[in-house]
Amino acid sequence: MDTTTMPNLLWHKPGVAIDASIQTFLAADDVLLDREFFLYDITASTAHAQALQRIGLLTPDELDNILRELQHLSDEYRNGTFLLDTQYEDGHSAIESRLTERLGDTGRKIHTGRSRNDQILVATRLWLKDRLTQLSTLNRDIAHHALQRAAAEQHLPMPGYTHLQRAVVSSAGMWWAGWAESFIDNALRAADTLALIDCNPLGTAAGYGVNLPLDRPHTTTALGFARLQVNPICAQLSRGKFELAALEALGSATLDLRRIAWDLSLFTTSEFAFITLPPEYSTGSSIMPNKRNPDVIELMRATHASVAAARTEIEQLLSLPSGYHRDLQNSKGAIVRGFNRGLAALELLPALLSRLQWRPDTLRAAIDPGMYATDAAIEAAIAGIPFRDAYQMAAKTADTAAQDRTPETSLTARRSPGAAADLCLETLRARWHTLTQPTSDPDPR
């Protein structure tokens, strides 16, 4: 058995051998993932040290020394002087190791009353708050661009499709307004999820509290949480569950991203030729000189698969009884991969939406006579013919339904709220304006 092992194992007992291969398996890439959470962990350690001083477990001088060293560690991590690597089991170990190295016994006091369990809970919670804030902002931005395009192009006719078959006359404005409302909903969902997870787990330790009068309300305020997560068992049950909720909010946005990317992929084909993409959103072929491929849109479309995979991984991890289990370590990789990929794709969408160009002549040419048949059936019903009879009449004359009709007259006639003649843009703008920017502490990076 190879007993060579990493130093700085917080849980190691003297005289107990550790198999290096087992330790490598246990740690996996955990410390590398902790680079995402490290500054949040330092922030939480600052609040915890203050809480310890408030109950007399640290002197004022000890607190000052700890806060100074935590700030130094944060600065060194930001500027690259301190590298969080595999000499440490995880980010928590790195923080305690640094404090002990610099402050001796004072540094060894930092872990009083806390566990790595509530450490990662609070660091992840702070990280998720910032990611959900970013998600909500991106959803608002996407909706904003879509609303602008809806207003500008509400009178531009285009085919409306069902089953990928031409159905009725629609408008570019209606297409845009549909995405605007969808991303307003996505912004609300992100904000609601942020409100759900905005609670402080620090001080719940390993899931059963500690025999100390920890000032948890103080750390709640210091860390910018809206409320305390009261029960330690509930705090442990929330690990994975809150990450899952956050990924579901992200997935709501990337699901719409996938569908709008699908539309754009179709509309850029020679067979449709409805839109022209900015050149930087396409690539070429390594063998076919004539090709311009919408690779950016295709990878946007694929993004939802990454988010869904992360969500599925966490769902499977949560087949556990109550309390902490090491399985949950794997939830970190899932949320990091899901959010990093999802947000990166969503960040590209506002500029794309503002710059793509419709081709009005092709849109109009794709509107065929049969697309007026529904209008004809409803007009006959208005004249007193039972709708089912009017439907049959219109079906027989669908090929000639365009007589005395234009795309513009069809659009003007569609007056039901939300339809082409009444997009209700003011209603959507009012909803958009209710999307207050979610509050979160600034990203420490």
Curated annotation (Swiss-Prot):
Keywords: Amino-acid biosynthesis, Arginine biosynthesis, Cytoplasm, Lyase. GO terms for molecular function: argininosuccinate lyase activity. GO terms for cellular component: cytosol. Pathway: Amino-acid biosynthesis; L-arginine biosynthesis; L-arginine from L-ornithine and carbamoyl phosphate: step 3/3. It catalyses: 2-(N(omega)-L-arginino)succinate = fumarate + L-arginine. CDD domains: Argininosuccinate_lyase (cd01359). Signal peptide: none annotated. Its EC number is 4.3.2.1. It comes from the Bacteria. Its main location: cytoplasm. InterPro entries: Argininosuccinate_lyase (IPR009049), Fumarase/histidase_N (IPR024083), Fumarate_lyase_CS (IPR020557), Fumarate_lyase_fam (IPR000362), Fumarate_lyase_N (IPR022761), L-Aspartase-like (IPR008948). Belongs to the lyase 1 family. Argininosuccinate lyase subfamily. HAMAP family: Arg_succ_lyase. This is Argininosuccinate lyase.
